[in-house]
Design a protein with these regions (language model features):
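Basic, Lys/Arg-enriched alpha-helical interface segments
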Residues: 1-81, 91-93, 101-135
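Short, conserved beta-strand/beta-arch hydrophobic-aromatic motifs that form part
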Residues: 98
C-alpha cells in the first residue's frame, strides 16, 4: 500500500481550510493527474477558486462552486468547463477527488459516483489509520 507524500497531495494550505488531492491506495491522484494535463488557464482558475475558499472559508458564487449531492455532501469547483468534485472533512479539510470536462447541462452521474466511492474509501482508510503517512 503506497502512501503519498504530504508535499504531493496538499494543493493549498489556507487560513480556514487545507485543500488536498485524494490519493488511492496505489498513490494515484485522479484529480491532480487530470489537472496536470490541462492548460495553464484551467490550472490557474482552479488555484484561484481553491485559494479563495481555503483562505476565506466560503465561495458564494454558485457558478464557481456548488453542492451537487446533498445526501453525500459532495461539491464541485467549476473552473471554465471543467468540474472538480470535492468534499469537506473534519479537521478543516477539503478533499478534491476527481474531475471531468463538462459536456452537457447535467452533472456526470458516472463521475459523481466515482467521487462518492473515493469519499467512502477516504473515510474508511482514515478510520483504519492507513491513509496518511505516519508522523
Amino acid at each position: 500500500m503506497a502512501l503519498s507524500k504530504k508535499e504531493d497531495y496538499i494543493f493549498y494550505q489556507g487560513e480556514k481550510f487545507q485543500v488536498e488531492f485524494y490519493f488511492t491506495e496505489t498513490g494515484e491522484m485522479p484529480a491532480k493527474e487530470y489537472l496536470d494535463k490541462e492548460s495553464l488557464g484551467v490550472q490557474l482558475k482552479l488555484a484561484a477558486l481553491v485559494k479563495r475558499i481555503a483562505d476565506h472559508g466560503r465561495l458564494f458564487d454558485k457558478t464557481k462552486f456548488r453542492k451537487v449531492d446533498s445526501k453525500e455532501n459532495m461539491f464541485e469547483f467549476k473552473p471554465l468547463d471543467h468540474r472538480f468534485f470535492s468534499f469537506f472533512y473534519e479537521g478543516k479539510k477539503i478533499i478534491i477527488t476527481n474531475a471531468y470536462r463538462k459536456k452537457s447541462q447535467k452533472v456526470s452521474k458516472r463521475d459523481l459516483e466515482k467521487a462518492r466511492n473515493m469519499k467512502m474509501a477516504y473515510t474508511n482508510r482514515l478510520k483504519e489509520g492507513v491513509y496518511y503517512e505516519k508522523k
